Amino acid sequence: MIIIGGTATNGIDENLSKIISVPLLKVEHKVFPDGESYIRIPQHITNQEILVVQSLYPPQDKHFVELLLILETLADMKNNKITAIVPYLAYSRQDRRFKEGEALSIKTILNAIARAGADVLIVIEPHKEEELSYFGKEVKIADPMPELAKEVSKKVEKPFVLAPDRGALERAKRLAEQLNAEYSYIEKERDRDTGEVRIKNLPELRLSGKDVIIVDDIISTGGTMIQATRAAYEHGARKVISVAVHSLFLDNAYEKLINSGVKEIVTTNTIPQDPSKVTVVDVSPAIARKI
C-alpha cells in the first residue's frame, strides 16, 4: 500500500501516512503559463493498493481536474486498487434540480471520479449520504465527530447541541451522543433565487443557561449559522459555539459569525484555516478508521 499526496491535501496525506504507517509519495506538480496543470507520479507504481489524497477546496475546478489526472495516471500504471480520499467534496450541495435545466453537479463529479479510475471513495461528512450513490462503487464515510467532540468538550459546561435545520439533525445527534448532551433542530427555508435563509419554525427549545453548540456540515457564507445563533440567544443560551466540518468562510463569514455572537468556532482541516481564528481538528484519524 502507498499513499499518493495530491496538489490539495492540507497536510492530511502526511498525517495519515504517520497514523497508518504507510509510505507517502507526493505528486510532481506545476502550472503551465496558460494556467493548465502538469501532473507527474515521480516513480512507476504497479500492482499496488493506492490511497490518493486530494481535497476539493477552492479553486475547486482546478483541484478536481488535478484529481482526475492523478487517478487516470495511476490507473494506466495497472494498479490493483485505487481509493480516492476526498476530504472536502466540492459541488455536494448541488444534489437536486430545483429548476428545470439545472446541472446535477454532484452526479457529474462522482461519475468522473469513478471513470478516471477510483475503485473506492472515502469522504468526510458529505452534505447528504444518498448523493454518494452516483459514484456507483464502494463508498466509505469517515466520521470526524469523535475528534470534534473532544475539542468542544473543553469549551462547554452545560452543552446543548442544535442543528440549524432538520437535515442536520442526525449530525447533531451524533455530536450530542459524544457529549452526553440534549439536542434539537431549527426549521428553516431558503429562497432558491436569492439564497436568503429564513427561520420557518422553532420547536420548543429549553436553552436557558446552556452552552449551545450549533453543528452543520459546512459554513459557506455563514447565513444559516447566524440565523441559528440569533435564535439560540433569543431562547436564553449562555453562549454559542459554532461547529462545522467544512468551513469556507466566504464573504467575510467569519467576522459576521463573531459579530452575531458566536464565541468560538471549531472546524476541521478538510479546507485550509487560520488557526489563530478557529480551532482546527485533524480528520486524518477519522480517515484512518476507514482504511
Swiss-Prot record:
A GO BP annotation: purine nucleotide biosynthetic process
EC number(s) stated in the UniProt entry for this protein: 2.7.6.1
Binding site for Mg(2+) 2: D165
Record keywords: ATP-binding, Cytoplasm, Kinase, Magnesium, Metal-binding, Nucleotide biosynthesis, Nucleotide-binding, Transferase
Subcellular location: Cytoplasm
Coiled-coil regions, chain positions: none
GO molecular function: ATP binding; kinase activity; magnesium ion binding; ribose phosphate diphosphokinase activity
Database matches in InterPro entries: Pribosyltran_N, PRibTrfase_dom, PRTase-like, Rib-P_diPkinase, Rib-P_diPkinase_arc
Cited NCBIfam families: PRK00934.1, ribP_PPkin
Protein name: Ribose-phosphate pyrophosphokinase
